[in-house]
Amino acid sequence: MTKPMTMSQKILAYHAGKEYVEPGDLIFANVDLVLGNDVTTPVAIKEFEKIGIDRVFDKDKIAIVPDHFTPNKDIKSAQQCKMVREFAKKYEITNYFEVGEMGIEHALLPEKGLVVPGDLVIGADSHTCTYGALGAFSTGIGSTDMACAMATGKCWFKVPEAIKFILYGKKTGWTSGKDIILHIIGMIGVDGALYKSMEYTGEGLKSLSMDDRFTIANMAIEAGAKNGIFEVDEKTIEYVKQHSTKPYKIFKADEDAEYSQVFEIDISKIRPTVAFPHLPENTKTIDEITEKIYIDQVVIGSCTNGRIEDLRIAAKILKGRKVKKGLRCIIFPATQNIYKQALKEGFIEIFIDAGCVVSTPTCGPCLGGHMGILADGEKALATTNRNFVGRMGHPNSEVYLSSPAIAAASAVLGYIGSPEELGMKGDEE
């Protein structure tokens, strides 16, 4: 009889062909998907070519998504994308997504059904942890490991300890998944889950949509975590059946599995939360912000909050209102399909009428890449995941993080505020 294991331990053990793994074990495991983007894949390609083989391990289990500097922002990014494009063509990579069919990688892969419960996914991007929302073990790696995995289908792992988050209660008002994860990071700190698995369970999951869960899992790395993972429930299965035909395997933590820490969180008590510069742990609830913080730019989108539910909330708030004069509001649907759905539901017209600019799917300003760089001294409120010094532009600029609801309301107000200041209650239709 094996010892009790957490969700992450079970997935790693299964893919390593072992009955049991424990925290600290170094293992080699078979991966179900290897992911890269236009920034990390060129380095991986160079390393892959040094190996001297003429094929990848499985052309169906590699996904390459140019999303960071696309559409090409300059000659260097154009050259990188060309290299990636040629590699994908040479090795007949099935899941290469060109401009026009692409999206931000961590929104695109679940939408395309490429990740299902029980999968082991690695990606040369730190926010690969997003897929834990589906009950998969997913984590970021470097380009060298990506190269080796493309060649062998394997990667090495150090089995992480786990922190258990038991969620109960229901979301209230304008609170969203973004507020829950900002609350958690504010509570444990940016290194509070260092190299650990953040595992979510409890009856509070019923109150969280899949988009909420993607947001929460996405920001596990902002707490230093190896991965974030949700217990699979009916909502997970419904989502997977809508998007994928791949077989899946559900791994449930044993009742007596060991955790380094256990937190019980009543999500009904969490209020809309804002992370102040220059760390995601510098959080205040909207009620604790006593001064008016005037902002120059609002960004709604990214792999954290660019999904249809996020745009729906933003449109609800911006409908019939105008962006404050002198403020820039940029909206990035996370994928082409999300863009199409937003068009169908009339959101794009609402955004344009409000004075926003709507962009093609791209990581763009989140990493200070393009499409909305901040100047010296400017302040931005963004639904992205990081607010480090210089993250979105000039080293003297400042980035605040929030949910789409707070971001949209702030775009109208001109300062960081809530939809409640516009006379809107969270349960309004």
Curated annotation (Swiss-Prot):
Positions with a binding annotation for [4Fe-4S] cluster: 303, 363, 366
InterPro entries named in the record: Acnase/IPM_dHydase_lsu_aba_1/3, Acoase/IPM_deHydtase_lsu_aba, Aconitase_4Fe-4S_BS, Aconitase_4Fe-4S_dom, HAcnase/IPMdehydase_lsu_prok, Homoacnase/IPMdehydase_lsu, IPM_dehydratase_rel_enz, IPMI_cat
Name of one Pfam family that matches: Aconitase
Keyword Lyase: yes
GO molecular function: 3-isopropylmalate dehydratase activity; 4 iron, 4 sulfur cluster binding; metal ion binding
Cofactor(s) of this protein: [4Fe-4S] cluster
Segments crossing the lipid bilayer: none
E.C. designation(s): 4.2.1.33
Reactions performed catalytically: (2R,3S)-3-isopropylmalate = (2S)-2-isopropylmalate
Pathway per the UniProt entry: Amino-acid biosynthesis; L-leucine biosynthesis; L-leucine from 3-methyl-2-oxobutanoate: step 2/4
Entry keywords, A to Z: 4Fe-4S, Amino-acid biosynthesis, Branched-chain amino acid biosynthesis, Iron, Iron-sulfur, Leucine biosynthesis, Lyase, Metal-binding
Record note on cofactor: Binds 1 [4Fe-4S] cluster per subunit.
GO annotation, biological process: L-leucine biosynthetic process
Family per similarity comment: Belongs to the aconitase/IPM isomerase family. LeuC type 2 subfamily.
PANTHER family named in the record: 3-ISOPROPYLMALATE DEHYDRATASE LARGE SUBUNIT 2 (PTHR43822:SF16), HOMOACONITASE, MITOCHONDRIAL-RELATED (PTHR43822)
HAMAP family: LeuC_type2
Its job: Catalyzes the isomerization between 2-isopropylmalate and 3-isopropylmalate, via the formation of 2-isopropylmaleate.
Assembly, per entry: Heterodimer of LeuC and LeuD.
Protein's recorded name: 3-isopropylmalate dehydratase large subunit
Origin species: Caldicellulosiruptor bescii (strain ATCC BAA-1888 / DSM 6725 / KCTC 15123 / Z-1320)
Taxonomic placement: Bacteria, Bacillati, Bacillota, Bacillota incertae sedis, Caldicellulosiruptorales
